[in-house]
Amino acid sequence: MSSHFRSFGSRSLYGVVLGLSALTLPGCGDHKAASQVESAPKVMLLNGDDQPLREDFNRDQGFVRLMVVVDPICPECLRGLADMGDDVLAKLPKEARIKVYVVHEPVIGGSDKDIPAAAELLHTTLAHHYWNPTGDFGRQMSQVLGLLHGSSPVFAWDIYMIYPPNAVWSGKGPPQPSYLMHQLPGLDNQKFPPWDGKLFATKVSDILAISDPKN
């Protein structure tokens, strides 16, 4: 897929990364060295069929599922992950029926070696981490979500999504989430609310409460 994606926005674009050129990429600031993680998470390579993410997603039916797409060195993405850890995951009860998937893409030059430090911000070992070096997942998710700046597609990254327990990944692309927040300038903020960790936490709690079989 290619080239009709464009770049715009207040973040500076750092250039072409593995075929992501001409995407709408609001870029991030300079990467600062992060602390080493004592126990590095397992990072799975995402293939052209979105495996093993697709298999994991469908296996986890019955759970509320959170999916995050980031570059592991983007400062705004790292802030989003930190908010996710502090405002959402750290405050959930231990028995919460929830799964977390984080797809990392090299939008501004991040690599799989940067994932452990980014993963540490979530304060949990329960998240599944995937590395998508081609950026194909971001293009695919952009189409699924209908991310547009005017008439131009916006590459999907720095996005935070909630899927209900009954969501099934049956088509070629991922299913539509029930809720999405983002940190991408230029999107319709009425349709796609900008990232707010505390509000996202409220939405997660609401969906957990609705789906709790004891309620």
Regions found by a protein language model. Name each.
Residues A119-P153:
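Short, internal strand/loop/helix patches
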Residues C28-D56, E76-R79:
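N-terminal "domain-start" segment that seeds a small globular fold
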Residues S12-T24:
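Bacterial N-terminal signal peptides
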Residues M1-S10:
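N-terminal secretory signal peptides that target proteins for export/translocation
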Residues F155-N215:
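Thiol-/selenol-based redox modules, centered on thioredoxin-like
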Residues L78-E120:
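Structural microenvironment flanking redox-active thiols in thiol-disulfide oxidoreductases
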Residues P72-E76, E105-G110, P133-G138, A167-W169:
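Solvent-exposed loop/turn segments at secondary-structure junctions
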